[in-house]
Amino acid sequence: MVDVELKVSSQMLADFLTFLYPPEEDGILAVKSDVFGKLLVAHLRGSDIPVTARSGDFVVKLRMPINDITRHFEKLWPYYNEADEASLNMALAAVFDMDFTGYYRKGESLGYQKKDIVDAFITSRKLFSADCFDVLHKRVYRKGQASFEAIKQRLIRKAYYIDESIDYKGLGK
């Protein structure tokens, strides 16, 4: 068994990791050989001397799958350095964003309301941290505003094009 600690950037991402890799009986998250699991294995480093335990609010303990790469770490103390953790946090946030966006679009296409989709996502992914509800609702609102602005700009450009085609003087003249 190869166990390693990873410090994630927020409680929401720590909860999401627990969704991706359900904990075993001892509470350690069992990493699978999926895409993100392979990334976790790829960033793993080994030390000949014991590594100090990570401290902080959002430290999760991971158990790596046994494969050709992780077998090498059975005789070493595995760890992630700060750069590895930063990269893995960025990748985890991207996986989270893709999962949320796909879930939201699917719910939207089925005609569900924004609040219901976000609530269902939070419940299904077991994201019970206090700020998760607000963070996801604000994200949906900001994306909605950006979409509205993009549509508005396209309509304005279309109106100017049509007006210039019809009236050689143009709208602004």
Task: Give each language-model segment a name.
Residues 147-164:
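Short Lys/Arg-enriched helix C-cap and helix-to-coil transition segments
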Residues 122-137, 160-162:
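Short, basic interhelical loop/turn and adjoining N-cap
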Residues 1-80, 84:
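Long, low-complexity interaction regions most often at the N-terminus
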Residues 106-125:
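Short, charged amphipathic recognition helices of the HTH superfamily
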Residues 138-150:
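Short, solvent-exposed alpha-helical "recognition" segments
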Residues 79, 84-95:
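Extended non-catalytic interaction/regulatory regions in multidomain proteins
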Residues 91-110:
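Positively charged, polyanion-binding regions of nucleic-acid-associated proteins
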Residues 161, 165-173:
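Intrinsically disordered, low-complexity, charge-dense segments enriched in Lys/Arg
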